[in-house]
Amino acid sequence: MPPKKAPAGPSKKTEQKKKEKVIEDKTFGLKNKKGNKQQKFIQQVQKQVQAGGHHPRQDGDKKKDEKEKKLADLREMASIFKPVQTQKVDKGTDPKSVVCAFFKQGLCTKGDKCKFSHDLSLENKVEKRSMYVDMRDNEDDLMTNWDDAKLKEVVDKKHSEEKRRPTTEIICKFFLEAVEKSKYGWFWECPNGEKCIYRHALPPGYVLKRDKKKEDKPTEISLVDLIEKERAALGSNQTRVTLETFLAWKKRKLQEKKAKMVAEEERKKSDFSKGKQFGISGREMFSFNPDLVDDGPIEEGDAAFDVYKREDDDDDNAFEFKELDLAALSLAAKEVDGSGTIASSTRLLDQATEAAKTAAAEDGAASDDENPSSSAPANDAAPFNKDLFVDLAGELDDLDLDDEDD
């Protein structure tokens, strides 16, 4: 039995009509618009519908994915073959202290002209050079390991060194200076050269000056630790701070302060009487000797003042302290009995009446003083002369005021 045929799909014309219908619905009323935005929107809708609902930028995404795939392949090839990268040296670093990367791969073609080093032993010198070992000492070079050639070389060297100055255990000053200034390392060379007879190693237990400064520096302690340390040093047999102990302490401190001020003032008085004026203010000088104020007659611009002797009254400056007892105060409190302490209800009216009577009496006394005899009024006015200003108009006309102004 032959297989069933697949149901026939819609024809191309039907699909095209549907797309045109969708475009017409989405752009209804926008075809006659001449704006740039409307026209772009219409074109975008047409492209989307004609493409079957897929965004036209999907092709661009495929190209982007292909490009990223190629870059990933290139990175994978680079990680496999590891090509030599250009070396970069920090500022201030000697290039000869760095091994050439091309030389390690066997690709350097510059030879002696290369600015980097072709000595592979430099990589073994990465470890920090010890300051307590002299590199010229050969401890492992024992006589048991020598052959005839080595023995002959040592003998010749021994006899040749006898002509030199004898060696010593004194440390080289250039070496110490380089160590103190942190300049000692694999590439440091002594100014005396390889023939330097002094030691280039520190003796065991030697402490540098810079380390001594760090040790001598006192350890800083925080404020909290200091307070806790002082509290622990006080011990347990201490007076507990209460209101009574605080008031007693405050009273004692005030008395000590007052006694100190009195003693200081007495000392200054004694010094002033002996002619010593150092540490004495001007106010204290005038208080000790008020006669200094009256130094002559008053001149123009001076201020007038009175001179009097100041009396010291210790009773005014006395401090009295009274301890409050809440229990005694609560026992002494009682309710108001109302006997002799309640104001009358008409006290305000009585006060107003008394004030009115007093004001009326004062007004009557004042009127009697101003008018002692009302029957005989005073007539102190001078007689008036009627002919005083008769010829005044003619005199004013004769005045030549314009000429004077000119």
UniProtKB/Swiss-Prot annotation:
Cellular component GO terms held in the UniProt record: cytosol
Annotated stretches, region: Disordered: 1-70, 336-382
GO MF term set: mRNA binding; zinc ion binding
Database matches in SUPFAM superfamilies: CCCH zinc finger
Any coiled-coil regions, as ranges: 57-82
GO biological process, one term: cytoplasmic translation
Feature: compositional bias, Basic and acidic residues: 12-28, 56-70
Zinc finger map (C3H1-type): 94-121, 166-203
The entry's keywords: Coiled coil, Metal-binding, Repeat, Zinc, Zinc-finger
Record field: compositional bias (Low complexity): 1-11, 38-50, 352-364, 372-382
Superkingdom: Eukaryota
InterPro entries, A to Z: ZC3H15/TMA46_C, Znf_CCCH, Znf_CCCH_sf
Family per record: Belongs to the ZC3H15/TMA46 family.
PANTHER family, sorted: ZINC FINGER CCCH DOMAIN-CONTAINING PROTEIN 15, ZINC FINGER-CONTAINING PROTEIN P48ZNF
Protein name per its UniProtKB record: Zinc finger CCCH domain-containing protein 15 homolog
Organism: Drosophila pseudoobscura pseudoobscura (Fruit fly)
Record lineage: Eukaryota, Metazoa, Ecdysozoa, Arthropoda, Hexapoda
